[in-house]
Amino acid sequence: MAKSKVVEKDKKNELDNQSADIELKGQSKNEESKGGKKKVIIVESPAKAKTIERILGNDYQVISSKGHIRDLPQKQFGVDLNSLKLDFEIIPGKESVVEQIKKMTSGKEVLLPSDQDREGEAIAWHLSTILGVKGKNIITFTEITERAIKEAVKNPREIDMNKVNAQLARRVLDRIVGYMISPLLWRIIKDARSAGRVQSAALKIICERERERYRFVPQKYFKVWIDIAGLKAYLTKVDGKKIKPTDITEEISKDVLQKVKSVRLVDIDVKEVRKNPPAPFITSTLQQDAASKLGFPVSKTMKIAQELYEGVDTKEGHTAFITYMRTDSTRVSDVAKEAAEKFILKNFGREYLNESSEVASKKGSKTKGKVQDAHECIRPVDVNITPEKAKELLDKDHHKLYELIWKRFIASQMSSAIYKQYSYDFESGKYVFEASIRERIFDGFEKVYTIDNEPSEKHKELKVDQEYLVEPKSAEAQTTPPDRYTEASLVKTLEMEGIGRPSTYATIIQTLLDRGYVVKKRKTLIPTILGFVVNHYLEQRFPDIVDKGFTAEMEKELDEVENGKKDWKEVVKSFLKEFNKDLERAKNEFFAIDFDTDITCEDCSGNYKLKVGKYGLYLHCPNCKTNKALKSDVFGVIDGNKLYVLEEQESQEENGEKNSVQSEESSANSGNRKFYRKRRTSGSKKSSTKSASSKAKKK
């Protein structure tokens, strides 16, 4: 099997090599036909090359390296742990690409556009090193527009080696963890694929949530309310004391149903509240919104966003639509602010302009640590390409994402929405019921960003000290366990914990899925038994690697390298000092996969044990010595030293799978109800209502 994969990989490399070779030769012929261009720009992707060449015309030749061209060796460690000298090699299959680039750039001025993150700077550094290019040859831009590109080529700069060093440190740390832990994993857990530095911390977060859900014991409580003038007023006080919904017992519920026949309105509070516009998108918030509103996986969002940034073929030519999509800054350039202001004034009026254009752009993200770079937010490159116009230029999914970005950006530059909030307190003996409702009096940014249903006006007829006939209602409910992570909520958690960076979120999730440590069911991320076993091993042998605090601290140190405050080699050596202790212990101490389970043996009624053998995880009965394969569709939780199998309680139809097309978050809500531990009771709700339909009547 491994040999087959190698052969397939070699064939793929050969095809990629031939494809790139043909492309570069074509570019060379094109150069000759134009009389030979003196300046060459090398970008990563053919799409970006096409867009930039259309902008710059005949003065520049723009060619593509088709991605990375140099990295640490695939089949060797490539790092001298004493000197930290790195043994880079041309990526297999890219040799002829490099040779062609060398020929085409010989004797010419070379410019290297760098994506505005560490990885982009490192790619430019690799290219400049291979080509022997020195001096000011780096150009940067956040959007592929005529203004931005022409401005960039006028102002080249030198390579930022602090950025490069931060990326080298990240690459070396990842290589150390992957190269040194993975063989130990393979020795103990045959099914395990590998262990990554940041992915392992993310796996632990997912496993901890599943364990938390397993340990959760539902608590029964009652919701008690009255319907009055289009409002739903809930019981909030008993004998003058605030009461939480979870503290409302069946006894209280029955007492309310029996005794409350009418209520008196004791207070109305009316106040004006402002709802501020959202900040423009950064990578993480775009991923979260695209998941919850469009149902896009993170990887799909980033793929489409990259294409919108680099440019897509339209009937009007190869056109870029958005700014750079890997960013953790909400900053908006002065040019973009001015364009948005003109658009808003023309289409909506002065009252829709943000009181301060800085408000939204100063919000930023809640990421622990620093924003990686003071770059721009994700926004449309031309606000005049409205979603309506873009619909004629883009396919369905590209248009959906563009519309999301366009609306978010325009909304961020608009004024606040203004609401009038009404709060009502109703009293009946020792019981107080509270209700509130908001009425929008000015839509502001919500004119483009959201559509709210108009509330009922009946509540305005209510008067203080008036008494109203009511028929209270009650419904039994249960507290629910914390939701499983979706891709969107995991990205939010990783961002808030300071784990990873915008460019890595999609890779982290995809790697866990590809390795079989996590599966996606109804848009929720569920750790597999293999994922739990791998996490258990890493927790026991390499606790720092899976510790989110430690991982976040490493990100801060990489930030300090980028800021020139720390030497990258010292950061790596400091990591190695502690890591080597765990590594030696893991090498020398015996570790066995031997978990008790709650799975019953069909032959002797004893309980199986979970073990690992030549072909991976299996079940073994210690009493009758029988073995049983562990099916891949079995899910469980390892808590302590025992595996508890989870059972599927609800059918797909009950989860609303029949005819609905759901977003990630709405799908996740049903998916989060799907697996429960064996001894947990069903979460069905019982209703107890005094009347199926009741209307508030003025007494």
Curated annotation (Swiss-Prot):
Catalyzed reaction equations: ATP-independent breakage of single-stranded DNA, followed by passage and rejoining
GO biological process, one term: DNA topological change
Domain Topo IA-type catalytic positions: 160-583
Active-site residues per Swiss-Prot or TrEMBL entry: Y324 (o-(5'-phospho-dna)-tyrosine intermediate)
Chain spans, region Interaction with DNA: 194-199
ZnF (C4-type) ranges: 601-624
Superkingdom classification of source: Bacteria
Residue intervals of the Toprim domain: 38-146
Biased composition (Basic residues): 674-683
Positions of transmembrane segments: none
Listed cofactors: Mg(2+)
Biased composition (Basic and acidic residues): 1-15, 22-35
UniProt entry keywords in alphabetical sequence: DNA-binding, Isomerase, Magnesium, Metal-binding, Topoisomerase, Zinc, Zinc-finger
Ranges of biased composition (kind: Polar residues): 661-672
Positions with biased composition (Low complexity): 684-699
Sequence positions that bind Mg(2+): E44, D115
GO MF annotations, alphabetized: DNA binding; DNA topoisomerase type I (single strand cut, ATP-independent) activity; zinc ion binding
EC number: 5.6.2.1
Region (Disordered): 1-37, 649-699
Sites annotated Interaction with DNA: H68, R170, R171, D174, Y179, W186, R326, R515
PANTHER family (alphabetical): DNA TOPOISOMERASE, DNA TOPOISOMERASE, TYPE IA, CORE
Subunit structure: Monomer.
Family: Belongs to the type IA topoisomerase family.
Function text: Releases the supercoiling and torsional tension of DNA, which is introduced during the DNA replication and transcription, by transiently cleaving and rejoining one strand of the DNA duplex. Introduces a single-strand break via transesterification at a target site in duplex DNA. The scissile phosphodiester is attacked by the catalytic tyrosine of the enzyme, resulting in the formation of a DNA-(5'-phosphotyrosyl)-enzyme intermediate and the expulsion of a 3'-OH DNA strand. The free DNA strand then undergoes passage around the unbroken strand, thus removing DNA supercoils.
Name of the protein: DNA topoisomerase 1
Record organism: Fervidobacterium islandicum
